[in-house]
Amino acid sequence: MKTQSLIDCIEMTDSYKRYGKVKRVIGLMIESKGPASSIGDLCLIYAKGQSGKVIKAEVVGFQEENILLMPYLEAASIAPGSIVEATGESLRVKVGTGLIGQVIDAFGEPLDGKLLPKGLSPVSTEQSPPNPMKRPPIREKMGVGVRSIDSLLTVGKGQRIGIFAGSGVGKSTLMGMIAKQTEADLNVIALVGERGREVREFIEKDLGKEGLKRSIVVVATSDQPALMRLKAAYTATAIAEYFRDKGQNVMFMMDSVTRVAMAQREIGLAAGEPPTTKGYTPSVFAILPRLLERTGANEHGTITAFYTVLVDGDDMNEPIADTVRGILDGHIVLDRALANKGQFPAVNVLKSISRVMSNISTKQHLDAANKFRELLSTYQNSEDLINIGAYKRGSSREIDEAIQFYPQLIQFLKQGTDEPALLEESIAALTSLTGNEE
């Protein structure tokens, strides 16, 4: 009986390998007649001539009976009639503890040209978000080593937060501080669409040797094709998921989700999607929730995620910023005006919020944070009157108190890049400053 079933399987097996052929290339898109494949499948295109070059491409759409492919790398060697082979699966990368301390590309290959260590497991970059009913509630704090965040915008294990800022306000520096000082087991950092110069600068200056020892950095620079930039985000997320499923608490950082959206916009427009708000295609707003919902907690471990959002002209209501803010569990606003005054990190605590802080903090801690915000808000609302000398002391008890405390508030918010700040010490300093000690 067993022999007969094996014979039946052999007879049903298609012994032919079917290939397709490139028909034309228009802009970023390659149109091919066959082979049979699905959206997201990885295909191999064999360049004509003596180069023997094999170019990886992904199926991004269909047009009549042809498939639309987008290459991961430059398509310079592709010509009409180039053979296309379907692999039947999506992009997979090799993951394991051997990647810690490495800087890799979207394919999971080291950028220094060295071979990958042995003992890595292949995982698909396309995963489903955890079942909402299997997500444990956030109940524990996650120290990030930044005093203003730990005390006033306390982050929980498995929380997802956006860092909203314009260019040159200190996003990379803040990410480096978090990577070096966080309580997490390891960092996974995605640098998407960055300038080539900035990548090495971030790794050597902001992250440093100590930070890199406990980090995996996934890089796709701005000169690379849109698909590589998009896949870098998926690869980094898949790596973080692997370690979360091993029971670890992962710190995940992506700089920036705006450039991920721009990469998807390029792909969507090339595939023929209609542009909507600010030229973004409908697929941009479809992939963002799918990508961002993959992080967080599951029954095995946690991914605490920080996504930077580059806001054009410091406009916090532009489409990507607005969409991401609605998906995440809180947002941190870096203010250019504070940076110009020399306050670093330039966190505007009055415009920022952590949506899980009330669930993981004591009443004493929350009262101290509210008191701090009240004092800072009172001073800022009256700052013009105070600066021109129009306010007379004694006119308002609240303003008098705010003036008295203001220098201490600003000093509390300032922190050097190499100045360590433990979670409990930051909270204790806050309660002491506001007089909310037990």
From Swiss-Prot:
EC number: 7.1.2.2
SUPFAM superfamilies with a match to the protein in the record: P-loop containing nucleoside triphosphate hydrolases
Lineage: Bacteria, Bacillati, Bacillota, Bacilli, Bacillales
GO MF term set: ATP binding; ATP hydrolysis activity
Cellular compartments per GO CC: cytoplasm; type III protein secretion system complex
CDD domains: ATP-synt_flagellum-secretory_path_III_C, ATP-synt_flagellum-secretory_path_III_N, ATPase_flagellum-secretory_path_III
Catalyzed reactions: ATP + H2O + 4 H(+)(in) = ADP + phosphate + 5 H(+)(out)
UniProt KW keywords: ATP synthesis, ATP-binding, Bacterial flagellum biogenesis, Bacterial flagellum protein export, Cytoplasm, Hydrogen ion transport, Ion transport, Nucleotide-binding, Protein transport, Translocase, Transport
Chain's role: Probable catalytic subunit of a protein translocase for flagellum-specific export, or a proton translocase involved in local circuits at the flagellum.
Protein's name in the database: Flagellum-specific ATP synthase
Subcellular location: Cytoplasm
Family label: Belongs to the ATPase alpha/beta chains family.
Region (Disordered): 119-139
GO term, biological process aspect, one: proton transmembrane transport
